[in-house]
Amino acid sequence: EASGQYTRELDAAVAKLEAGIANLMEPEIGHLTRLLSSGGDVLHVQCAGGTDTLSLLLVGASTVTGTDISPNMLAVAEEKAARLNLDAEWVLADTARLPETLHNRFELVYTGRGALNWMMDINIWAQNVCACVRPCGHLFIFEGHPLDWVWDETARALQIQPDYGGYFDTNVASDTEWPTSYIDADMEPVAGWSKKHERQWTLGEVVTAVAQQGMIIEVLSEHPEYYWDAHPLLPWDEMKKLPHTYVLIARKPAE
């Protein structure tokens, strides 16, 4: 359903990549450049339209592979790579059931920017993504901070959503529509759109799930930058005092 947004943005995404501009944010770039200083095979889990995947080539990746559950998204990603004459592998796969052919293949497994909220079992997620990391390789997560789910996005002053259970809420949010900050605000819902299910995972839950796979936590940092316009009505002077994203880097021990 949301692939239409990526199709409409295809020309702009290709032009940006062609100009050598990575679709990555400041909190990510320094870490990624360091981790990929000697190159490496990179897997991007839940790659959507592939712009971020191909951007990883601009910060040092030797090869990139993207997985997504949507064949339409992968078709958009493949078109971008073809236009740019870039070699990339695209794999149709559910993150909760990544194929064994991806296991232990990658120096870096990259994910985030609205990926974990679609996972209904954080431990199964961790088991799958960590299985794809080579010994001595890294898992890299750049994700929205779970605290952002607490704030009322319709308010003009910082306040907790009145109908939300708080930071530790484990309820699943379900809707047939997409956020207007994710797709065009004027894109009308289509009859028959599937119901989407999201839930938030606390920092503690994410870090624990990764650590329980035997990964060694190297970096956990929090940042004021948004990767999407989550609170358009709230003043930036106030919101910049809070974390809106985080970076988690974990290393798989040598065998």
Regions inferred by a protein language model and the residue ranges of each:
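Conserved alpha-helix/loop element of class I SAM-dependent methyltransferases that forms part
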Residues: 7-40
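Class I SAM-dependent methyltransferase SAM/SAH-binding core
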Residues: 40-98
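A short acidic, Gly/Pro-enriched loop at the edge of an enzyme's catalytic core
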Residues: 100-109
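A short glycine-rich, Lys/Arg-flanked "PGG" loop and its adjoining helix->strand segment in the class I
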Residues: 123-138
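Conserved class I S-adenosyl-L-methionine
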Residues: 138-182
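Acceptor-substrate binding/catalytic loop of class I
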Residues: 146-156, 189-205
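Short alpha-helix
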Residues: 186, 197-221
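Core SAM-dependent methyltransferase catalytic element
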Residues: 213-215, 233-255
